[in-house]
Amino acid sequence: MQLCLSQCPGVLAGVSTLFNRIDGIESLLHAGAVMDKQTLTPAQLAAYIDHTLLKADATAKDIEKLCAEARENQFYSVCVNGSWVGQVRHCLEGTSVKVASVVGFPLGAMSGDAKRFETEAAIDDGAHEIDVVLNLGRLKAGDDKYVLRELRDVVEAADEWPVKVIIETCLLTREEKIRVCQLVVESGAKFVKTSTGFSTGGATVDDVRLMRETVGPKFGVKASGGIRDTQTALAMIEAGATRLGTSASVAIVKGLAEIKSDG
């Protein structure tokens, strides 16, 4: 007796969700596998990229364009503010491109309950990944218990989907960067991420290298903020980044193709 999935939409949706989860887990297994930039192809570089649009004045038309670029170039994901998650999920339906939503963006200063609610809403709307901003004030005050509890709440609310924690490296001392990376690993999140791109600075090679040294070889490290050209993207990967967040994704991949064609 055969089961007709087309007559069982609930089962079909469950199967789709399962395959998305498996795909996400598979990507995490390779989170620490940094490619050799000398042999990196444009397609492989595209698979590092969260194609990002987080401007306050982004319109529905801008989001459509973002998704079209992601489909064409096969970027790993599209990263947007929470209000656009549903539209992005619809635009990317039938593709392998994931949907990522920011939470607590860009300051990270709202309550933990608010971040939890925002995370749950994003997952309900179809997000496959969450990029949450850390509460920097609590971290700087030495309230590690608060920071860890808040991050664990977000991880729980994400319901096993990967969580990336934005630590805003430009506002931290070296010691704080090390401490917060350790907290992120302990929280159950899957990535530590450099920056929002909305503060006083973005990703640096030195910060990415320090983050990689702190979290170890198998944990995800995402570089974001100020990555606008191919050489910067490659430098971040060489330093240990396993994901890149950028709005200049198309130019970055095109730049690598041009470098390869020039020999």
Report each predicted region and the residues it spans.
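Alpha/beta enzyme core
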Residues: T39-N73, S83-F105, S111-V221, D229-V250, ...
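Short, compositionally biased "basic patch" segments
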Residues: L29-A43
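Short hydrophobic "strand-cap" motifs at the C-terminus of beta-strands
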Residues: S224
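Short, positively charged and aromatic/hydrophobic N-terminal segments
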Residues: Q2, V11, N20-A31
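N-terminal beta-strand-loop-alpha-helix module at the start
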Residues: V80
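Short N-terminal alpha-helical targeting/association segments
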Residues: L12-L18, P42
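Short, charged, intrinsically disordered terminal tails
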Residues: G255-D262
